[in-house]
Protein backbone atom coordinates (compact mmCIF):
# COMPACT_ATOMS: atom_id res chain seq x y z
CA UNK A 1 0.00 0.00 0.00
CA UNK A 2 1.43 3.38 -1.01
CA UNK A 3 2.06 6.19 1.43
CA UNK A 4 -0.33 9.13 1.02
CA UNK A 5 0.86 12.56 -0.10
CA UNK A 6 -1.16 14.44 2.54
CA UNK A 7 0.07 15.08 6.07
CA UNK A 8 -1.75 16.60 9.03
CA UNK A 9 -0.52 19.99 10.22
CA UNK A 10 -1.40 22.52 12.90
CA UNK A 11 -1.87 26.22 12.09
CA UNK A 12 -0.82 28.30 15.13
CA UNK A 13 -1.87 31.92 15.65
CA UNK A 14 0.91 34.53 15.55
CA UNK A 15 -1.06 36.69 18.02
CA UNK A 16 0.29 34.43 20.84
CA UNK A 17 -3.20 33.50 22.03
CA UNK A 18 -2.60 29.75 21.93
CA UNK A 19 -5.40 29.25 19.41
CA UNK A 20 -4.79 26.86 16.52
CA UNK A 21 -6.52 25.14 13.63
CA UNK A 22 -5.76 21.64 12.35
CA UNK A 23 -5.78 20.78 8.66
CA UNK A 24 -3.88 18.73 6.14
CA UNK A 25 -1.82 19.65 3.11
CA UNK A 26 -0.33 17.94 0.11
CA UNK A 27 3.40 17.91 0.86
CA UNK A 28 4.27 17.23 -2.79
CA UNK A 29 2.48 20.34 -4.12
CA UNK A 30 3.32 22.60 -1.15
CA UNK A 31 6.77 21.65 0.17
CA UNK A 32 7.23 24.93 2.09
CA UNK A 33 5.63 26.07 5.34
CA UNK A 34 2.04 27.24 5.01
CA UNK A 35 1.04 30.77 6.12
CA UNK A 36 -2.57 31.92 5.90
CA UNK A 37 -4.74 34.65 7.43
CA UNK A 38 -7.61 33.20 9.46
CA UNK A 39 -9.97 34.38 12.19
CA UNK A 40 -8.70 34.20 15.78
CA UNK A 41 -11.72 34.16 18.13
CA UNK A 42 -9.60 35.08 21.18
CA UNK A 43 -8.63 38.51 19.81
CA UNK A 44 -11.71 38.63 17.52
CA UNK A 45 -9.85 39.57 14.35
CA UNK A 46 -8.06 38.00 11.40
CA UNK A 47 -4.39 37.26 12.07
CA UNK A 48 -1.62 35.31 10.36
CA UNK A 49 -1.44 31.59 11.17
CA UNK A 50 1.78 29.64 10.61
CA UNK A 51 2.28 25.93 10.12
CA UNK A 52 3.57 23.76 12.97
CA UNK A 53 3.93 19.99 13.39
CA UNK A 54 1.29 18.02 15.26
CA UNK A 55 2.92 16.26 18.20
Swiss-Prot record:
<dbReference type="Pfam" id="PF00471">
    <property type="entry name" value="Ribosomal_L33"/>
</dbReference>
<dbReference type="GO" id="GO:0006412">
    <property type="term" value="P:translation"/>
</dbReference>
<keyword id="KW-0687">Ribonucleoprotein</keyword>
<dbReference type="GO" id="GO:0003735">
    <property type="term" value="F:structural constituent of ribosome"/>
</dbReference>
<dbReference type="GO" id="GO:0022625">
    <property type="term" value="C:cytosolic large ribosomal subunit"/>
</dbReference>
<keyword id="KW-0689">Ribosomal protein</keyword>
<dbReference type="InterPro" id="IPR011332">
    <property type="entry name" value="Ribosomal_zn-bd"/>
</dbReference>
<dbReference type="InterPro" id="IPR001705">
    <property type="entry name" value="Ribosomal_bL33"/>
</dbReference>
<comment type="similarity">
    <text>Belongs to the bacterial ribosomal protein bL33 family.</text>
</comment>
<protein>
    <recommendedName>
        <fullName>Large ribosomal subunit protein bL33</fullName>
    </recommendedName>
</protein>
<dbReference type="InterPro" id="IPR018264">
    <property type="entry name" value="Ribosomal_bL33_CS"/>
</dbReference>
<dbReference type="InterPro" id="IPR038584">
    <property type="entry name" value="Ribosomal_bL33_sf"/>
</dbReference>
